[in-house]
Amino acid sequence: MGNFKMDSIRNVVMMGHGKSGKTTLAEAMLINSGAIDRMGKVADGNTISDYDPEEVKRQLSIQTSMIPIEWKGMKYNMIDTPGYFDFAGEVKEGLRAADSALIVLSGRSGVSVGTEQVFKYAKIKGVPIMFFVNKMDDERASYQRTLEEMKEKFGKSITPDRK
């Protein structure tokens, strides 16, 4: 890890409904940044952020964890939070340390109750919100359907990035 000035560091909380793929997305970010050379899998119990024995056993995040990622001269502290309501305190804790929120949705499930809840948390905190539609490799996933659901639930300000 290099040394970074404060204006080159971002704290981004990753939030979303349970099983939307937040931890797997964090693993993909780590491998693409070169921080790791093999992507861990939740099912195999070898991800960077879900290291607690109970998380490995349950195959889900129970506590908030921070994953530092260096990318294009910036340092991103990705704050991986649990997706189930039982651990809402952990989500709020992660959001408290964040400059922005990345809400992860499953392209198959679309907008879920947990998605709506974390959106409310981020709006209350007043941080910029980004959405990431995940799990697009599922044959029943639909980016367009998920985008339309997001516009319906969160307003017309939802605009896709076409890059």
What do the PLM-derived regions correspond to, one by one?
Residues 134:
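Active-site glycine-centered loops adjacent to acidic/histidine catalytic or metal-binding residues
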